Amino acid sequence: MARSLKKGPFVADKLMKKIELLHSKGEKTVIQTWSRSSTITPIMIGHTIAVHNGREHIPVFVTDQMVGHKLGEFSPTRTFRGHVKSDKKSKR
């Protein structure tokens, strides 16, 4: 179920304050955050946000096409190492 429109998008308060501060200064430094559930808003466009994936912070450069998505969508938490090769000779 989608979030109610009367509530508006969720953005962590601490993250929003950091972005507004950098936006007013005109700086483009990397912002570290653990808030993967925060929604990307238009004020975040052009900033680089390092999103935590459980092990490290992955830098995400926000573009206009990302508005409306969550920050966690752009920092994968699992590493895919490929499927196991089936060895038919060892099964016999």
UniProtKB/Swiss-Prot annotation:
Q: Which InterPro entries match?
A: Ribosomal_uS19, Ribosomal_uS19_bac-type, Ribosomal_uS19_CS, Ribosomal_uS19_SF
Pfam families assigned: Ribosomal_S19 (PF00203)
> Per the record, what is one GO cellular component?
mitochondrial small ribosomal subunit
Major subcellular location class = plastid
| Any one GO MF annotation of this record | structural constituent of ribosome
Reported function: Protein S19 forms a complex with S13 that binds strongly to the 16S ribosomal RNA.
Which UniProt keywords are given for this protein, alphabetically ordered? Chloroplast, Plastid, Ribonucleoprotein, Ribosomal protein, RNA-binding, rRNA-binding
The answer to keyword Zinc applying to this record is no
| Subcellular localization, as worded in the UniProt entry | Plastid, Chloroplast
Q: What gene makes this protein?
A: rps19
Q: What's a BP term from Gene Ontology annotated to this protein?
A: ribosomal small subunit assembly
Q: What is this protein called?
A: Small ribosomal subunit protein uS19c
Organism of derivation = Ostreococcus tauri
Concerning its family, UniProt says: Belongs to the universal ribosomal protein uS19 family.
Report whether Ribonucleoprotein shows up as a keyword of the record.
Answer: yes
